[in-house]
């Protein structure tokens, strides 16, 4: 309510009337669902895949579950920074692409990748340095604490690939409507690599939790390689609204 009041009170460009809200052309509807449907499917399949990770970890015993839960909780706090960066990337690039400034959008994408890399290195170094004081806040056994520490080190090692994927998939590729490729990257990475390796490592090979976690994280490298190739193809570098009435 506050946001709507501000938008219409200030008569911002998005303060449109009912005619504008519901005056959809057939091309607009087709473009909207063609772009948004893969995003919805992407989030659903990715969320379901991460649930499967939890099922695999849950079969490894209480200590393994405790270790991975603590490690991922610590990691999730840090990931918020890159989620915000990827969202900012999508907004800024989407604005430039919508205005037809394709060259500027391409330049900004490079800047965001550089910013992401610098932030990743900085956060990874800090995380490695403070992991033991943070782990010390938990009342856990030395064995669980060791596993948490190893999981955090593994996460730090994979951070460049994982955070690149955040900015590339959510910020760059989606801003240009390349959502089908985003769906392919996330779904294939989770379901063809991450989930099979999680269950193989946990139930068949009987590996320690940190080794299973390292196997699962290889999906980020897969997505980073294919995602970078897709980024270089520049199929995302387009104005989605140029011909929509």
Predicted regions and their residues:
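Short alpha-helical transmembrane segments in multi-pass integral membrane proteins
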Residues: 1-36, 93-158, 201-245
